[in-house]
């Protein structure tokens, strides 16, 4: 389990203050794929931190393969009701947002581990491309 220390949140706060034009996300709905990965989880924590400390009122939609993994990863933040979960597998590009319409999409999902690239490079790149195409199709709706 990730330990959220005061020092950690101080770092998150410092990073959030360095992001140019971050106010454009205030009150918006943001879909994040790969929310439990290294980059995706950092983005989630920054946005939720800004909701709690600066009344950012950002609605965060976390898209991933496992609701329980997302709940476990963000267990100290999950009870605040700042985010929704959508099932998404980047390999399959199967995302149905239903009535949730994101203003922005942050695509951080990717089967990009070195083993996948070494053993199945074409399949890995196709998964990345088809996942991106599926997300772009959502924006066209």
Tell where the protein language model's regions lie, with residue ranges.
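NAD(P)-cofactor binding segment of oxidoreductase domains
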Residues: 105, 119-141
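Conserved NAD(P)H cofactor-binding loop of Rossmann-fold oxidoreductase domains
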Residues: 108-112
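N-terminal Rossmann/SDR dinucleotide-binding element
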Residues: 1-104
């Amino acid at each position: 389990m990730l330990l959220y220390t005061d020092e950690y949140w101080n770092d998150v706060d410092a990073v959030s203050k360095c992001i140019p034009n971050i106010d454009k996300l205030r009150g918006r709905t943001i879909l994040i794929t790969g929310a439990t990965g290294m980059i995706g989880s950092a983005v989630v924590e920054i946005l939720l931190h800004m909701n709690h400390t600066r009344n950012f009122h950002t609605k965060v939609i976390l898209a991933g393969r496992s609701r329980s993994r997302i709940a476990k990863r963000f267990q100290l933040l999950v009870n605040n009701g700042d985010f929704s979960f959508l099932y998404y597998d980047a390999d399959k590009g199967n995302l149905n947002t239903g009535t949730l319409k994101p203003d922005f999409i942050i695509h951080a999902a990717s089967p990009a581990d070195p083993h996948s690239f070494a053993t199945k490079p074409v399949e890995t790149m196709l998964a990345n491309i088809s996942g991106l195409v599926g997300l772009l199709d959502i924006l066209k709706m």
